């Protein structure tokens, strides 16, 4: 059976290390680690969130 193209992942805040968001990505289109600037409710500001596997 073929491997799935879309993988599920968590986005972790780079400042407080809390995992705030769950999302998925297409690993063919974005092979590198995903980095998004999202709001962290624990830090109460927008911070960079990096991809972490579930």
Curated annotation (Swiss-Prot):
UniProt entry tagged with the keyword Ribonucleoprotein: yes
Cited PANTHER family: 50S RIBOSOMAL PROTEIN L33, CHLOROPLASTIC, LARGE RIBOSOMAL SUBUNIT PROTEIN BL33C
Protein's name according to its UniProt entry: Large ribosomal subunit protein bL33
UniProt GO MF annotations: rRNA binding; structural constituent of ribosome; tRNA binding
PROSITE patterns recorded: RIBOSOMAL_L33 (PS00582)
Function according to Swiss-Prot or TrEMBL: Found on the solvent side of the large subunit. Contacts the E site tRNA.
Cellular component, GO, one term: ribosome
Keywords: Ribonucleoprotein, Ribosomal protein, RNA-binding, rRNA-binding, tRNA-binding
Protein family according to the UniProt entry: Belongs to the bacterial ribosomal protein bL33 family.
Domain of life: Bacteria
The keyword Ribosomal protein is assigned to this record: yes
Subunit organization: Part of the 50S ribosomal subunit.
One biological process term in Gene Ontology: translation
